[in-house]
Every structure is written in structure tokens, then in C-alpha cells.
Amino acid sequence: MGFARLKISTRLALLLAAMVLLTVAIGVVGLSGMRQANAGLNTVYLDRVIPLKQINLVSDAYAVDVVDAAHKVRDGGFPQQQALASLEKAKKDIADNWSAYLATELVPTEVRLVRQFQQLKAPADKAVQTIETLVRANDTAGLTAYAAKEMYPANDPLQEVLGALVQVQLDTARAEYEGAVGTYQGTKLFM
């Protein structure tokens, strides 16, 4: 029995069923593409945007809060208690944001940079402790000498690694975006 021999009502029912199936298939493909795009956006936000902020807060704590406290105490712009509070806040910000960053999904390049950071963190933390000790002792001359000769060599290599981690966030977010564009193009071709 051929298609031509079917009653018109049967042919219309089959045509309608085919159209419904095609519409459902297009909808499923569209939803799948949207799900993939949403997952990519979620990854970009949770594993790139938030970590970018965390890395910047760690960087600022070392490069701005600690260094600024040392210079302001040395120059007389910060009373001792304010400098100590700033140093404590910097240490807390570093610990909180670094541990939160480590809880995200790291790509292989990040893992390598995190290892580098961990090695450089000990001397930078020692520098923070030394600055804190000098501030507690009201040793302005010692703080001036330390800031001039030892503070930056302990901090600068750390900043380079943090800068590289920022770049990894941007590069990985770009790659995720390009993947989403590819998914969109593939879905668009199907539809």
C-alpha cells in the first residue's frame, strides 16, 4: 500500500505527525544548545569571573594594603594601630580569598602557577610579618630600611605570578566563549 493510496485524512495525519516530530527535534536541539551555553556561562562565572576577583583581592592585599601600610607608617600618615589593623585585614583577605580561589576548578596552567605562588608566598608572608614586627616596635628606621631593600623583592615575584593567573582567567573565559559560539553555530546549522 503506497502513500498515494492512503486516504487524505490519513496523509494529513502522517504529515502532521512528521511536522510535530520535526518541531520536537528542533526544540530538543535548541534546548540542548541552550543547556550547553548555560553550562559554559556558569563555568565562566564560577571558575573565571569570581576567581579573577579573588586573585585581584590577594594581589591588592599584598601590593596595596601591606605596602601602603608600611609607607604610611614610615611617613607618619598612619598611626600604629591603624597600620596593624590594615596588616591584619590584608592577612585575612589573603587567606580567605586564596583558599576560596583554590576551591574552584583549576586548569593545568593554573595548577602550575599555583605551585609557583605557593613557593613565593612564604617569603611574601614573612615580609608581612617583618613589617608587622617593625610597626609594633615603632621602629621607623628599621621599617624604612626594610621597605627600601627587602619588601619589594619579596612581593614583586608574587605579583608576576598573580598577574599570570589573571591572564589565565581571561584566556580560559575567552576559550569558553569561543566554544559557546561554536555550539551556537552548530545548532543554527541544524535548525
What does each model-found stretch correspond to?
Residues 155-166:
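Extended, hydrophilic extramembrane loops/domains of integral membrane proteins
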Residues 40-126, 130-154, 174-175:
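Membrane-proximal N-terminal soluble sensing/regulatory segments of transmembrane proteins
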Residues 21, 119-121, 161-162:
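Intrinsically disordered, low-complexity segments enriched in polar/charged residues with Gly/Pro
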Residues 34, 93-94, 158:
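Hydrophobic residues within well-ordered alpha-helices
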Residues 1-53, 59-79, 98, 132-135, ...:
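Hydrophobic membrane-targeting segments
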